[in-house]
Each structure stands twice: as C-alpha cells, then as structure tokens.
Amino acid sequence: MFYLIASAEGFSRLFNLIRYITFRTGAAAITALLIGLIFGPRFIGWMRIHQHKGQPIRDDGPKTHLAKAGTPTMGGLMILIAVSISLFLWMDFANPYVWACIAVMLGFGVIGFIDDYDKVTQNSTRGVSGKVRLLWEFGIAFFACYLILKDGNTQLYLPFYNGPVIDLGWFYYPFAAFVIVGTANSVNLTDGLDGLATMPVIIASLAFFVISYVVGNAVFAHYLGIPHVPGAGELTILTGAIIGAGFAFLWFNAPPAAIFMGDTGSLALGGCLGTIAVATHHEIVLGIVGGLFVAEALSVIIQVGFYKRFKRRVFRMAPLHHHFEQLGWSEPTVVIRFWIISFALALLGLATLKLR
C-alpha cells in the first residue's frame, strides 16, 4: 500500500524512502514483529479458550512431552496474519514472485490449518491423510512454479560452480515442486520441540534475504557470477516480514511454549522458503542453508525404510531431535545446539555465493 502511495505523483519526495527495498524490508520486519508482540497474548488466550485440550501429544513420543498436554496449537495463524498485514503495507503488488510465495504460504497454511483443526477436534495425532495432503501441496506448488517460470529460465545452478549446469526444461517443474513440498514437510518434521523450528526458519530467511537481494541486483549478480533474476529483490520484503513475525512468535514459543506453531505455520513457512529458493534459482543452496531440515527429514526416511527392510532401527527415535532426547540431552540443549548448527549452515550457504 505504502509502495503504491510512494509511486503516485506528488508523493515522490515525501515517501522517497519507501522506494528502497532495504527500507521496506526493515519496515516489514518491524511491522510484523509489533503485530505479533501486541496481539500475541490475546490470540493465545483466545486459542486456549476455544481449543480446550490443545495440541494432542503422541503416546509413542518421549515421555517428557506428555507434560505439554493442553498447550494450544495453530500458532502459525499468528505468524501468517502478521506477515500478510506487513506485506500488504510494504510489498510491490505487481511482483509475480511475491504472489507465488504468498500463494504457497497461504495455500499450505490452509492445508496445515485443516490438519491442525482435525487433530484438535478429534483429539487425535493423525490429522488429514498424508496422500491427500501431498496431492494439494503439489497442486499449489505447480501453480507457484507456473507463476515463477514465466521468464522461461529452467536452468539448474550448483553451489561453488560458476554458471548453469544444465537446462532441465519441462523437468524443472516437478523438480521445483519437489523442492517446495519437500521443504514444507521437512520444516514440519523439525517442529517437534519448543522453538526448534522457529529459529532455523528465521536464520534461513536471513540467508535468503541476502540471496534475494544480490540475485535481484544486476551488478552484484554479475560480480558474484550468480543468476540475475529481475524483480527477485522484492522477496527481501517477504523474508523481512517472516523474520519479524518469527521473532514475535518465538517470544511465546520459547521453552516452555505458551503455544505451538502447528502444521499451520510449519507447512506455510517451509513452503514459502522453498518457493523463495526456486524463484532465486538457489534450490541446492537451500539444501545447505536448511541442512537441519534435510537431516530431520532424512532421519525419518532412513528410520522407516530401514525398519521395513530389516526390522531394526537406525536411530533411537525419529525425527533426529528425538534421537538426541533419548540419548539424554535435555530439550533446551537439543534446541540451542540445533540453532547453532543451523546458523553455521546458513553461513556456509552464503559462502557459496562467493566461492565459485
């Protein structure tokens, strides 16, 4: 909204700052942060009243988690509302990349909300069928890929390598959709401890703030030897809003959590990160920056596959964070150490921009 005002004749001098992406990114972060902090307590109180029993706790999980019974879920709604309002105020509505990310964020958020609602109302940990959920997720992801790939760039870029490796052509669509859906569900699997998924999402968003900015800037992109995507710089406003809303949510999600993110938030934020990676053509770098999410997802895949084949478990419990809990690590220890790993991986991912 403010961007449109700044573009209007007669307001150019008064609102000149709004033309700058960096200013709008900071403003979006502060706006989302304030919305979350101010309205968070009321939102949590409302959720406590209407959810009664709160988030169902798995019987086969760590026994220490049973003490969390009654904690409300669907906290991702708070994040989505804060991000959406912030984007409405600060984004450029004419940018197709932002709309692709919003479509995934809200679409996956709806899927997660339905899943959370089903769990809460049925007092069950099962939720929506996995096949049904994946079907809708891939449908939304392919739509986002259609919006993003109108420029026709279907080339694949690798870290530490200067220039494109291969033109995937039509195969880029399923590849990109897999990145989006895979990231969403990986973040969803990571969201198992208080604050565990929130900070890595914030860290990954910070990394892709940098990536989006340099990819959208022709001078920086040419200097670094990375793909230049005109208009991708606008995605920094989205990353700023996610960072601000994420910190606001973490204020209430820090141990002991007053509210859980739920599938509403984890699917939406993970899908949005995947879409940003596709839009900036840094899909493989996302695998480095979001290496924690990849490790969590792989631990589940390995555990299930190995057990089906050999009737033995590789990990004491999956996802990976539960394995370390079973080794005797306290929940805060697991969370903080995973945060440190996430930060280190983000630095490594950013290093690939220069080391080519």
From Swiss-Prot:
Gene Ontology terms describing biological process: cell division; cell wall organization; peptidoglycan biosynthetic process; regulation of cell shape
PANTHER family: PHOSPHO-N-ACETYLMURAMOYL-PENTAPEPTIDE-TRANSFERASE (PTHR22926), PHOSPHO-N-ACETYLMURAMOYL-PENTAPEPTIDE-TRANSFERASE HOMOLOG (PTHR22926:SF5)
Cofactor: Mg(2+)
Catalytic activity: UDP-N-acetyl-alpha-D-muramoyl-L-alanyl-gamma-D-glutamyl-meso-2,6-diaminopimeloyl-D-alanyl-D-alanine + di-trans,octa-cis-undecaprenyl phosphate = di-trans,octa-cis-undecaprenyl diphospho-N-acetyl-alpha-D-muramoyl-L-alanyl-D-glutamyl-meso-2,6-diaminopimeloyl-D-alanyl-D-alanine + UMP
Molecular function via GO: metal ion binding; phospho-N-acetylmuramoyl-pentapeptide-transferase activity; UDP-N-acetylmuramoyl-L-alanyl-D-glutamyl-meso-2,6-diaminopimelyl-D-alanyl-D-alanine:undecaprenyl-phosphate transferase activity
PROSITE patterns in the cross-refs: MRAY_1, MRAY_2
Family: Belongs to the glycosyltransferase 4 family. MraY subfamily.
Annotated protein name in UniProt: Phospho-N-acetylmuramoyl-pentapeptide-transferase
Gene Ontology annotations for the cellular component aspect, listed alphabetically: plasma membrane
Transmembrane domains' residue ranges: 27-47, 74-94, 97-117, 128-148, 164-184, 201-221, 241-261, 284-304, 333-353
Membrane topology: Multi-pass membrane protein
Superkingdom as given in the UniProt entry: Bacteria
Described purpose of this protein according to its UniProt entry: Catalyzes the initial step of the lipid cycle reactions in the biosynthesis of the cell wall peptidoglycan: transfers peptidoglycan precursor phospho-MurNAc-pentapeptide from UDP-MurNAc-pentapeptide onto the lipid carrier undecaprenyl phosphate, yielding undecaprenyl-pyrophosphoryl-MurNAc-pentapeptide, known as lipid I.
Entry's EC annotation: 2.7.8.13
Keywords, alphabetical: Cell cycle, Cell division, Cell inner membrane, Cell membrane, Cell shape, Cell wall biogenesis/degradation, Magnesium, Membrane, Metal-binding, Peptidoglycan synthesis, Transferase, Transmembrane, Transmembrane helix
Organism: Zymomonas mobilis subsp. mobilis (strain ATCC 31821 / ZM4 / CP4)
Species lineage: Bacteria, Pseudomonadati, Pseudomonadota, Alphaproteobacteria, Sphingomonadales
Alphabetized HAMAP family for the sequence: MraY (MF_00038)
